């Protein structure tokens, strides 16, 4: 079941983040290796009602689905976005270590696509680190197109993708 996250989920989500950081580090991906995302990030997402959890008896995964404009997407390099209309942004997706390879991340992506459809939002955007091959495969599996790259606020480059809905 996918539902909005609540404050009672914070501990479980932070454990999933810890797992994800270790996985990324083991795979030489310099993403989430600082103090991000952290408890404040998660609580902010919960308060804004933009964090969702996948639950089967316990929280196994989470995803942030954001309807507001993503500042770092205002300028895209070596390409262009597919759509200039409204869009959703997918951020902060991770699956509990024991639940990897159970297609849960795909279910969360499909949920985001359905979410956009129901709200008549024209597209979904997502970005990831160039070394995060697992995430790139997930993004492409769901028919996102690589549009170029963007820079985060800390000036780190990210591959930028979009899917028309």
Predicted regions and their residues:
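Conserved beta-hairpin
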Residues: 49-64
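Conserved GNAT acetyl-CoA-binding A-motif
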Residues: 109, 116-128
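A short beta-loop-alpha structural element at the N-terminal edge
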Residues: 1-15
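Conserved acetyl-CoA-binding loop-helix of GNAT-fold acetyltransferases
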Residues: 95, 101-114, 137-141
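Conserved catalytic-core motifs of GNAT/GCN5-like acyltransferases
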Residues: 127-128, 140-159
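Conserved beta-strand-loop-alpha-helix junction that forms the acyl-donor binding cleft
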Residues: 100, 126-135
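Conserved GNAT-fold acetyl-CoA-binding loop/helix
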Residues: 21-41
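Conserved acyl-donor/pantetheine-binding loop and adjacent beta-alpha core of acyl/acetyltransferases
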Residues: 64-94, 100
